[in-house]
């Protein structure tokens, strides 16, 4: 069992003998992971990581937040605040890279306004000085 007061995972590695070989049950999560999806290629990479490396071995429980620029625009950036509050609640999160808009991105994405950096917003809410991605 892994327990760092924030993430609690109970590993059930019960090996069962089947007719065709051995199988292991998945690691069970007791605390959900706050999943902050990002923009562009990071969406694809995160999905590959989940599908290939995590889901086959872990009964992955997540609370999903789409921090892609289009969705932040649709929600007036409320999704960024909600994801940070969920991180405070559960104590563990994965955040993918996001776009901080500039003038060119404002036109490209037809943004309502030039939204602040999600990293800066999340750092302020969580009282952090640095986010490692």
What are these regions (language model features)?
Residues 4-23:
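Short, Lys/Arg-enriched N-terminal segments with co-localized hydrophobic residues
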Residues 24-129:
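Contiguous, glycine/small-aliphatic-enriched amphipathic segments in soluble metabolic enzymes
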Residues 131-133:
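Conserved small/polar residues in nucleotide/adenosyl-binding loops
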């Amino acid at each position: 069992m892994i327990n760092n007061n924030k993430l609690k995972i109970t590993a059930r590695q019960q090996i069962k003998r089947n007719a065709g070989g051995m199988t292991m049950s998945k690691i069970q999560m007791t605390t959900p992971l706050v999943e902050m999806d990002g923009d562009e290629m990071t969406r694809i990479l995160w999905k590959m990581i989940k599908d290939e490396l995590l889901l086959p071995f872990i009964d992955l429980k997540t609370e999903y937040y789409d921090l892609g620029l289009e969705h932040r625009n649709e929600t007036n950036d409320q999704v960024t605040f909600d994801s940070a509050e969920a991180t405070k609640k559960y104590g563990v999160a994965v955040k993918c890279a996001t776009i901080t808009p500039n003038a060119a991105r404002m036109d490209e994405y037809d943004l309502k306004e030039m939204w602040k950096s999600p990293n800066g917003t999340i750092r302020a809410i969580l009282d952090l000085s640095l986010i490692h991605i």
